[in-house]
Amino acid sequence: MSTLLIVNPAAGGGRAARALDRVLEALAPLPPFDVFVTQPGLERPAESAARDAVLAGATRILVLGGDGSSSQALNGIYAAGGAEALARVSLGLLPAGTGRDYARSAGIARDPVAAARALARGAAARRVDVGVIEFPDGRTRLFLNVASFGVSAQIAHALEEYPQLKRRAGAVAFGLATVRAGWGYSPVETELRVDLQAAQRGPTAAVAIANGGWFGGGMHVAPSARVDDGLFEVVRFGDLARRDFVISLPRLYRGTHYTHPHVRHSQGAEILAAPGVGVTQPIEIEADGEIVGALPARFSMLPAALSLLA
């Protein structure tokens, strides 16, 4: 089959499972396609399924799930053939997760059935940018939406450890986890360099390296970010006191935080990030909501690398 539909039934607290029959009905006008349903307990099942399908000749991968499943599918396509595979395989998203942040950034319907109907009507493919994270040990991880470190990674870690929180609280889970992590996190010394700009050194609560504008279940972290402009929006939250961080959360959701004196933003296509001098604790990195490693790391852009059905 030239098309594979990957389904994560647990996405969105079961939203994907509840929508599956209607999604299949909406996709009925398409040529026959295979369906892969992920099972709990497997490591990155959507990634393996996408890789195997592309190696077998698939040219279109559809994902009914959340941002994490979509990111896994992206990495699976890349694992099957690098940039060449990204160029020839289209990715279609049927957003059913808790946050559905990338869909908002990319202009995709945030209802999975509506997105499926658009695909069945012949949604046009558009070229979008893809972020790349490179680690000193040679590992590489791609991301669609946002990569970050600091308190934001601690939030992702908490949601990974307690998935029942997302199942029970839905999008509110991101806010609850943010308040909890923000209250217990202290800024740590980091060094950040964006393109050829001077290095930013100092206490850091969080850094978001954004291809899309929203993350964390509706936080408008990078209001100027575009998924097809070839640039990251880099947002650094500096030496924010715990109380100040929590109080500032409404501004983060509204996208008005750039005026805060401890928030700095810039644009670039290559970012180098490392722990500050003397820092020994791991500073974890999350990408599209999944912990993928720790600093130091290089973040770069693959402009117009992916064919996105939207």
Residue ranges and their predicted role:
Residues 194-201, 220, 226-227, 232, ...:
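ATP/nucleoside-binding phosphotransfer catalytic cores, i.e., glycine-rich phosphate-binding loops
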Residues 148, 152, 208-222, 291:
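Glycine-rich phosphate/pyrophosphate-binding beta-alpha loops
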Residues 17-19, 74-77, 104-106, 220-221:
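Short amphipathic alpha-helical segments
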Residues 67, 207:
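Short conserved active-site loop signatures built around small residues
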Residues 12-16, 216, 308:
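Short N-terminal binding/cap micro-motifs at the start of the first secondary-structure element
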Residues 1-64, 71, 75, 113-116:
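ATP/NTP phosphate-donor binding region
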Residues 7, 37-38, 65-66, 94, ...:
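Small/polar loops that bind or transfer phosphate-bearing groups
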Residues 29-30, 40, 78-205:
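Catalytic core of DAGKc-family lipid kinases
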